[in-house]
Amino acid sequence: MHNYLDNIMPDFSIENEILKLKNNKECIIVGVDEVGYGSLAGPVVSAAVFFPNYNNETTQDINDSKKLTPKTRQKIYNKIITRVKWSIGFAHIFEIDEYNILNATHIAMKRALTGLNAHIDIDYVIIDGNKIPNIPWNAQAIIGGDTISTSIAAASIIAKVTRDRLMETLHIQYPQYNWNKNKGYGTKDHITSLYKYGKTIHHRNTFTPISKISYMFKNS
């Protein structure tokens, strides 16, 4: 069954509404999104993005990264990184295990925003999701924000391409887990390899499949 929502593209409606409410056309509004929340391996990666000019004509192909093919995503990534101000933030495996995935995601978001704020003075932040991290800027969380806001959608693309490249690099060292294809997520082939080879230093120990497999290897 076709979902008509699939045809709806992100735009700058939210950004423009914020500009009107603040009565400030110079207000710097930054979109934030993360990638890797549910993965079994690898870091959480967040991106923060600011468009200097809100122009729908030059951003009409930008969409939620999950709706794009890898080839299209890479093409759009190459185009937008030259047109926006952006920054990346990581939360590493030990942080995910120590602070939990939600808090680690917020750490990654804060790092991305801090990196971007070193170059521009952020006024307002719009974030994909339903929770706002502890940040020193006024912010709004938007469920499904990457399907609504172009700024957030662009952040999702930059974060996704960055993380995918990292997992493809790690695949060279650990080819048995097929990270070049599954990007660390819990696919059937990834789970099968975990039971066969055990975990790596890049796996998240507090995630149930990993903790279960660690216990199995420890007691075998």
From Swiss-Prot:
PROSITE patterns: RNASE_H_2 (PS51975)
Annotated InterPro entries: RNase_HII (IPR022898), RNase_HII/HIII (IPR001352), RNase_HII/HIII_dom (IPR024567), RNaseH-like_sf (IPR012337), RNaseH_sf (IPR036397)
Reaction it catalyzes: Endonucleolytic cleavage to 5'-phosphomonoester
Coiled-coil boundaries: none
Cofactor binding description: Manganese or magnesium. Binds 1 divalent metal ion per monomer in the absence of substrate. May bind a second metal ion after substrate binding.
Disulfide-linked positions: none
Keywords: Cytoplasm, Endonuclease, Hydrolase, Manganese, Metal-binding, Nuclease
Gene Ontology MF annotations: manganese ion binding; RNA binding; RNA-DNA hybrid ribonuclease activity
Record's GO cellular component terms: cytoplasm; ribonuclease H2 complex
CDD domains xrefs: RNase_HII_bacteria_HII_like
EC numbers on record: 3.1.26.4
Cofactor(s) in the UniProt record: Mn(2+); Mg(2+)
Domain RNase H type-2, chain residue ranges per copy: 27-220
Principal place of residence: cytoplasm
Entry's localization field: Cytoplasm
Enzyme class per UniProt: hydrolase
Keyword Methyltransferase among record annotations: no
Function, in words: Endonuclease that specifically degrades the RNA of RNA-DNA hybrids.
Protein name (database record): Ribonuclease HII
Organism taxonomic ancestry: Bacteria, Pseudomonadati, Pseudomonadota, Alphaproteobacteria, Rickettsiales
